[in-house]
Structure formats: C-alpha cells, structure tokens
C-alpha cells in the first residue's frame, strides 16, 4: 500500500478544519447514599428546590432538601439501578408534566407517561407540577352549579363550579362511588374530569376505568394513577400533576372537575419521604408542613374572573377516616381548607341508605349560591323536614303513644329517606330531582307504601317526560312550575297501581 505524504497532510488539515470544540457545562454531583427512594447527593451547589435531577440510566429525581454540602433528592421511579458514586446532573427545570387535549381519554402515571397500552401521547406543551394558585383579584365567587346527579347532595349539600368539597368517611362507605357518579353525570355538560388515584390497588383502578368506559365518560376524563406498589415520591407528586393538567384547561376558559382519591394516602407518602429525609416529625409523626402540603394543592382550584376567561376547577378531595374520627390531624386540616364536606356514615350505609350522606354534619359553605332557583325552593324545606325526622325518630324509640302530628312527620321522614336512596352509577337529572323532592315535601307520597316509592319515582319521571315536557323546561328556566307539577302528580297517582 503506497501512502503519499501530501494526501495524509491534506486529510489531517481537513479534519482540523471541520473540528468543532463543543464544551457542555453542567452542574454535577455524586451520589453519597441511596435507598428507600431517597438519594443524598454531594455537590449541586446551585440546585433549586423541586428541581428535576438526572441520574444515570434515564432515572429522574427531585431535589427537596437543600443543605450546605448535600442535596436530599427523592427518586421518581426505581432506585435499584442507582449506586454510590453515580454522577447526578442538574436539568435546570422544575418537575413538569405534559398537558393539553392529547391526554383526554388516557391513563397516565404521576409524570404524565401513558400506562394504558395505547401508545405514546402526542403532547405539545408541559406545565410545572407546582404552580402558584390564582390570587384574590383573579377569582370570582362561585355561582354556577356543578350537578353530581345525586339527590341528597344536589339538594342539601350543593356544589358549585370552582368549589372545593371534601368527601370524608370510613373505608367502604361509598366515597369513590359518589365521585364516579359525579364524573358520569358530567356527560354532555362540557366539563373535563381528572381522576387522581393515590395509593390504590391496580385492580381497583382497572375496574374504575372500565366503569368510566362503559358510561362513555372516558371521552372527557384523564386518569392519573399512582398505585400502592409505586414509590412514595410518585404518590406524593400525583395530585400536583393532576392539578397542573387541570390548570391548563382552566386557564383556557374551560371547566374542570378534579378528584383526589385519596389525600390521606398522599399524606402518608409525604410522611414517609420526610422521615427518610430526616425532617423533624410533629403530631402523628407528620412533618410540620403537612398542612401546606394540602392547602397549596387545594387552593389551585378556583373560579376564574371573566378577564381571565371565566374557567373553573372544582376539586373533590377524599379523606378516609378511622372509625369515624373526623377530629384526627389530616381530616381536620382538610376540613379547614375546603369549602365544605360531605360526611358518609357507616351506620347509614349498612342500614341500606345509600349514598350514606349524613346531612347533619355535612355542609356546603358556598354551593347554596350556585343552586338553580327551583332546587333552592324545594331544598330548604327538605333539609328542615329531614333533620326534624332524625330528631323525632331517635325520640320516638322511647315513647309508644305518639300523637297524630308526630306520626305524620315520621311517615313523611321515612319517605324522604326512601327518595334519597339511589343506585350506584345512576345519576339523576336535576329537573327530575326537583319533581320527586317537591312531591315528598308537599305530602303527595303519604298514601304510597314505602316499598312502592322507588317504582313510583321512576314511573313519575317517565310520565312527566312523556306527557308534560314543559314542566322540565320551567324548572330549568326558573319559572313557576308548582301548579303544573301538582296537577301532573295527582293525575299520575290516579293511574299508579300500588303493589302489596
């Protein structure tokens, strides 16, 4: 092989000419210790709180403890591949998730990555998981109703768009059923729903997704899932990721309903992380800032002013109590942050009153101004009659000889309890709710036996819809409907066949 010196020199000159010296400057650190989803990283002097850190093998972490020489980071994923001495890079970005229309109908994890096997998500925008809540000037008071389709809630504990309403109760009292029914009831109402599952079983989430699919609700719903088998940091970050996805729609003038199921598990995950990061424990071993954990999340739900597009984000956080103890640390924290609570009582649930809403200690602090006129008219009387019945029922257990008035009130109360019962995944239109509540408070059901009431109710809806559709229009339009509805109920009662 004959090599000419001039050829070699021309090749070398060409190489030198084309050489570009690219120097990439990144702030790096090295792993000192790792375990239980927590890494101590030496270096990274300029790291920000909440910054995304890159570990080897495309594993990411989040800087939480910023000390003089060491950064305490939580690992968002599997920490088994990370070892002592590994190089950690700063990304210069706060943890962010994909947002926008592309996520609707999908099931994603806490970082917005798809886990439903339907391929990648074609998103064009991301948002930081932590962002500042709208200020006082940016908000307007809640005035539009958000119908749940559940009679006891829409009448006595109404929810408005932009409200935060806590759902609280022991395990297995129907908390998730209420929020699923609320999501199903948003069909055709131009509301985007986000369901954030924290610390739940995968089988439960699979069941829930199939319920939403059957009801056609997945077309306007995003499911964010951080299951019980995932690390504490992913369970901690899931609600903030869901809120970021919702904010994108809210700031674009749309209406969002977001469910956090449930925040007690998020608090437990945060406690685990904080103790591993050696933060000082407080009451029930929770860190001192556990109130701020939930307040900064729930303050992001708002009804925006018209100048900002008038969008809204309604939050339904769920808290699980132990043996009905609503005065524990986390329940009292969240009760004080939210605009009211729906308390589900195990005794009611087991006695067959489902949904097991206890109107005695349930309250909606701002929802009353969001009720439609017709519902406001009938709901006040209903709540009063129901609470009087509860009092009388407890008292009448001790007395055998009751006067006629007391017997009448007890009979009416029994019928109120009966009409407030509702099957799972069977939301009822607000105009139909008004009809049956009007019937019971005006004693139109006093001669109908208790075991016939459910049938009477469903047949009444069909009768009015088929023969007097204008009544529904009047109820929704805020016109006077009482005479027409009374006549329709009386006509229907004549045709109704009581089954013994």
Swiss-Prot record:
Entry protein name: ATP synthase subunit alpha
CDD domains (alphabetical): ATP-synt_F1_alpha_C, ATP-synt_F1_alpha_N, F1-ATPase_alpha_CD
Gene: atpA
Location of the protein in the cell: Cell membrane
Record GO cellular component, one term: plasma membrane
Keywords for this protein: ATP synthesis, ATP-binding, Cell membrane, CF(1), Hydrogen ion transport, Ion transport, Membrane, Nucleotide-binding, Translocase, Transport
Entry annotated with the keyword Translocase: yes
Bilayer topology term: Peripheral membrane protein
